[in-house]
UniProtKB/Swiss-Prot annotation:
Organism, scientific name: Shigella dysenteriae serotype 1 (strain Sd197)
Task of the protein: Catalyzes the excretion of spermidine.
GO terms under cellular component: plasma membrane
Subcellular location field: Cell inner membrane
GO biological process: glycine betaine transport
Phylogenetic classification of the source organism: Bacteria, Pseudomonadati, Pseudomonadota, Gammaproteobacteria, Enterobacterales
Pfam families recorded: Multi_Drug_Res (PF00893)
Transmembrane region(s): 6-26, 36-56, 64-84, 88-108
Family: Belongs to the drug/metabolite transporter (DMT) superfamily. Small multidrug resistance (SMR) (TC 2.A.7.1) family. MdtI subfamily.
SUPFAM superfamilies cross-referenced by the UniProt entry: Multidrug resistance efflux transporter EmrE
Name this polypeptide is given: Spermidine export protein MdtI
GO MF annotations, alphabetized: amino-acid betaine transmembrane transporter activity; antiporter activity; choline transmembrane transporter activity; spermidine transmembrane transporter activity
Entry keyword set: Cell inner membrane, Cell membrane, Membrane, Transmembrane, Transmembrane helix, Transport
Gene responsible for this protein: mdtI
Length: 109
């Protein structure tokens, strides 16, 4: 793997933001009944994978994918809480803690 460069971290951050945007648009699409939000969600997913493909040029795939997925899930949970009033139950919180612990373990290995 190439030496770490901040540009790859920036690509990863962009991929995470685009994943969150895609998930929010998907919720707004109401099961694709509101087609414009469905199409925007698909475009954001494509853009997220494109950004992720640039990130893995300088970050190990396993690390980049774990961070992308983990931060994407955690931030999507926050967006669901802020925008839609969605709450996690106790099992959901335990799952989130395990997810974050897993991300840390992958990064440390």
């Amino acid at each position: 793997m190439a030496q770490f460069e901040w540009v790859h971290a920036a690509w990863l951050a962009l991929a995470i933001v685009l994943e969150i945007v895609a998930n929010v648009f998907l919720k707004f699409s109401d099961g694709f009944r509101r087609k414009i939000f469905g199409l925007l969600s698909q475009a954001a997913v494509l853009a997220a994978f494109s950004a992720l493909s640039q990130a893995v040029k300088g970050i190990d795939l396993s690390v980049a994918y774990a961070l992308w997925g983990g931060f994407g899930i955690a931030a999507t949970l926050a967006a669901g809480w802020i925008l839609f009033g969605q709450r996690l139950n106790r099992k959901g919180w335990i799952g989130l803690v395990l997810l974050l612990a897993g991300m840390i373990m992958v990064k440390l290995t």
